[in-house]
Amino acid sequence: MGPTASGKTDLAIALARKLPFEIISVDSAMVYRGLDIGTAKPNEEELQLTSHRLINICDPSFPYSAGQFYKDALSEIKTIEIRNRTPLLVGGTMLYFHILEQGFSDLPTADETVRKKIQEEAAQHGWAKIHERLNAIDPKSAARINPNDAQRIQRAFEVYETTGQPLSSYQSLKRFKALPYQFINLILAPENRSWLHQRIEKRFDQMLKNNFLEEVRQLYNRGDLNSDLPAIRTVGYRQVWKYLSGEYDYETMRHKAIAATRQLAKRQLTWLRRWPDAKWFNSEDKDLISQVVDYLKGIGM
């Protein structure tokens, strides 16, 4: 586990080449075919050398859910077990990790810092404006909430700001139980936040050089996709989509995509700091791979 751009995929591939692991992607965007550059998906050569399960399994028009992931991941884990190998779950969609390991029963607890921030914004702009913003990130919840219902708007927005997942995605998870497996939680993150921020900016600029705009343009030109679909709401894709529709100019698109990616990383780190029984590794360490391999061998892997 780790924030976006922390080096999870490279580490996972290295581990799978050294140990009897098979990788399962835990990423709500990599499931979609055609979302390659903007998700930093492993390339064809990497996928041939080390297979990744739950990558490229559905069309962007399909609203893939946490519930569907739970079922798919369980099936893949069982398949890997039959092969007498160990599943290596890799990604940054914290809700997916959460329902596998801890199950799901209640909504996330309130975060007073986030709540205060939302209240200050509402005092300045009004709850109707906050409702408009909610509609952009969680249209299902926004459709059920009156624009003047401050309490429900605040809670829905708070859940998203804290977890990076819309409230509506939680409301379909009450039936899921934690899987009956022992999880070894490894968290990869840099100690220096500025390192991650710089890496996020450099990575997005490299995506643009690698024809990310053309990738999104192909999706845009299909005609059957829209900005409310989970695939298109993915960080980076959402901003380029607005650029293609004329809502943003190029520099605004770039700035907002980088800022949104940094906010995503912040939300992911909020989840991770609360994660029980986790071993942290520093993304910046040059001997990272050997550190992780030694740790895993030391606990009997």
UniProtKB/Swiss-Prot annotation:
Record-listed E.C. numbers: 2.5.1.75
Classification via InterPro entries: Dimethylallyltransferase, IPT, P-loop_NTPase
Gene Ontology BP, a term: tRNA modification
Region (Interaction with substrate tRNA): 27-30, 151-155
Class of the enzyme per the UniProt entry, highest EC level: transferase
Pfam families linked to this entry: IPPT
Binding-site residues, substrate: 4-9
Transmembrane segments: none
Entry GO MF terms: ATP binding; tRNA dimethylallyltransferase activity
Cofactors named for this entry: Mg(2+)
Annotated residues for binding of ATP: 2-9
UniProt site (Interaction with substrate tRNA): 93, 115
UniProt keyword annotations, A-Z: ATP-binding, Magnesium, Nucleotide-binding, Transferase, tRNA processing
Catalytic activity: adenosine(37) in tRNA + dimethylallyl diphosphate = N(6)-dimethylallyladenosine(37) in tRNA + diphosphate
NCBIfam families: miaA
Known function: Catalyzes the transfer of a dimethylallyl group onto the adenine at position 37 in tRNAs that read codons beginning with uridine, leading to the formation of N6-(dimethylallyl)adenosine (i(6)A).
Homology family: Belongs to the IPP transferase family.
PANTHER family named among the record's database cross-references: TRNA DIMETHYLALLYLTRANSFERASE
Subunit structure: Monomer.
Name this polypeptide is given: tRNA dimethylallyltransferase
Source organism of the structure: Coxiella burnetii (strain CbuG_Q212)
